[in-house]
């Protein structure tokens, strides 16, 4: 689960992390009061969306002006102007795709006298099963580009969970950032605070980009991005309250209610599969035959008829779907249950696009019989290759 920058900074404040003062703005009429509260003389108006690249992004609407999603204001009037221009407009960044995201919230923050910018993040390293830190002197930039162009400028290390964070980890960060004296001590303290927050809140990623050194010699988090482990959210009702469903795909929200693993994609063929590995293979073979999947959807091993029906309804709710491929290998998941769910869903929502069903495994004959006797216009497939070719041909009208 992702949260907004201003929410991430509020979480970090709980652990004593130094962050800039700011005020969230939900409506334009709040702009002047927020600016006066911070005092100025310089303010930063930041778009709050769940995507990176906001500063270099562009708004779709001409009325939003030609500046990006992060703007520097030097007067209260300019703050009000930017808020009016940005709030409610659609921001397109490298991470939003061409559709962009509507900016429903802004964050007004005090300006900062920046001497240096750094990069610092913590994440779950799946190779070592540990929390790893990524550090670089190249702050304020796309870290993927830094890793590609100048990998020697990135330092990484992991923390042994048996010992937890140790003083030498903080010293390693200070050394990587070329900090000495009091600034090095600040870095050591910050690393300890970030690790503590990461563990306490069950985060999966914590990114500070940039971490700045002010001209007054203070280390401060100028931006913050936090992702939480969705499997651990139940332990943190306070974190759940931070969820902004307007930033999430409506279909993904609906899928989460039924414990379905659903990810919206930008293709035309809807997929319903059991098992993540088989689902990935299904997406690949659709691409192989010249089309693109509209979603990743794993119904899991113990899906009920109700769950299958919900999955089918979610797929058909996508207006981009021109065809549907159901690919089930029944083990724990029984083919007759899938078949009954598909039939029930089709009868409930109607079938306006081609549907190919491939069933194999437990109760496969019963499943095929249910579909065959349903009277529905369903194309049966013998194997995955056959299924992919049939749905691609059907979508292309061949």
Swiss-Prot record:
Binds 1 Mg(2+) ion per subunit. InterPro entries: ATP-grasp, ATP-grasp_succ-CoA_synth-type, ATP_grasp_subdomain_1, Succ-CoA_synthase_bsu_CS, SUCC_ACL_C, Succ_CoA_ligase-like_bsu, Succinyl-CoA_synth-like. ATP binds at residues 46, 53-55, 109, 112, 117. Gene3D superfamilies: ATP-grasp fold, A domain, ATP-grasp fold, B domain, Succinyl-CoA synthetase domains. The keyword DNA repair does not apply. GO terms for molecular function: ATP binding; magnesium ion binding; succinate-CoA ligase (ADP-forming) activity; succinate-CoA ligase (GDP-forming) activity. One of its GO terms (biological process) is tricarboxylic acid cycle. It comes from Afipia carboxidovorans (strain ATCC 49405 / DSM 1227 / KCTC 32145 / OM5). Heterotetramer of two alpha and two beta subunits. Keywords: ATP-binding, Ligase, Magnesium, Metal-binding, Nucleotide-binding, Tricarboxylic acid cycle. Its cofactor is Mg(2+). Pathway: Carbohydrate metabolism; tricarboxylic acid cycle; succinate from succinyl-CoA (ligase route): step 1/1. Belongs to the succinate/malate CoA ligase beta subunit family. PANTHER family: SUCCINATE--COA LIGASE [GDP-FORMING] SUBUNIT BETA, MITOCHONDRIAL, SUCCINYL-COA SYNTHETASE BETA CHAIN. This is Succinate--CoA ligase [ADP-forming] subunit beta. Its EC number is 6.2.1.5. One of its GO terms (cellular component) is succinate-CoA ligase complex. Mg(2+) binds at residues 209, 223. Succinyl-CoA synthetase functions in the citric acid cycle (TCA), coupling the hydrolysis of succinyl-CoA to the synthesis of either ATP or GTP and thus represents the only step of substrate-level phosphorylation in the TCA. The beta subunit provides nucleotide specificity of the enzyme and binds the substrate succinate, while the binding sites for coenzyme A and phosphate are found in the alpha subunit. Substrate binds at residues 274, 331-333. Residues 9-254 form the ATP-grasp domain. It comes from the Bacteria. It catalyses: succinate + ATP + CoA = succinyl-CoA + ADP + phosphate; GTP + succinate + CoA = succinyl-CoA + GDP + phosphate.
């Amino acid at each position: 689960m992702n949260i907004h920058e201003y929410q991430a900074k509020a979480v970090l404040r709980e652990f004593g992390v130094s962050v800039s003062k700011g005020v969230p703005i939900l409506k334009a009429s709040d702009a002047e009061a927020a600016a006066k509260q911070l005092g100025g003389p310089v303010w930063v108006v930041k778009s709050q969306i769940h995507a990176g690249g906001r500063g270099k992004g562009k708004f779709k609407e001409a009325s939003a002006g030609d500046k990006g999603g992060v703007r520097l204001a030097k007067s209260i009037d300019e703050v009000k102007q930017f808020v009016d221009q940005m709030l409610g407009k659609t921001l397109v960044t490298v991470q939003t795709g061409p559709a962009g995201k509507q900016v429903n919230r802004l964050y007004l923050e005090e300006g900062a006298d920046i001497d240096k910018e750094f990069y610092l993040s913590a994440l779950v390293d799946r190779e070592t099963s540990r929390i790893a830190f990524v550090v670089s002197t190249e702050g304020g930039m796309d870290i993927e580009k830094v890793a590609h162009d100048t990998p020697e400028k990135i330092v990484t290390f992991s923390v042994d969970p048996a010992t937890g964070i140790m003083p030498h980890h903080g010293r390693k960060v200070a050394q990587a950032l070329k900090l000495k004296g009091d600034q090095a001590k600040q870095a050591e303290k910050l690393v300890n605070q970030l690790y503590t927050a990461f563990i306490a809140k069950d985060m999966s990623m914590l990114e500070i980009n940039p971490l700045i050194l002010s001209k007054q010699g203070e280390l401060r988090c100028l931006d913050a991005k936090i992702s939480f482990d969705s499997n651990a959210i139940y332990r943190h009702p306070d974190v759940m309250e931070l969820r902004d469903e307007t930033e999430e795909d409506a279909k993904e929200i609906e899928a989460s209610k039924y414990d379905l693993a659903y990810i919206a994609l930008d293709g035309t063929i809807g997929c319903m599969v059991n098992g993540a590995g088989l689902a990935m293979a299904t997406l690949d073979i659709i691409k192989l035959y010249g089309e693109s999947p509209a979603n990743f959807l794993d119904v899991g091993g113990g899906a009920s008829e109700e769950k299958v029906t919900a999955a089918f309804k979610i797929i058909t709710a996508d207006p981009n779907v021109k065809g549907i491929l159901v690919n089930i290998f029944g083990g724990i998941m029984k083919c007759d249950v899938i078949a009954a769910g598909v039939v029930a869903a089709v009868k409930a929502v109607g079938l306006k696009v081609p549907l190919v069903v491939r069933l194999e495994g437990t109760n496969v004959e019963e499943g095929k019989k249910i579909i065959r006797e349903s009277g529905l216009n369903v194309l049966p497939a013998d194997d995955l290759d056959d299924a992919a070719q049939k749905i691609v041909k059907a979508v292309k009208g061949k």
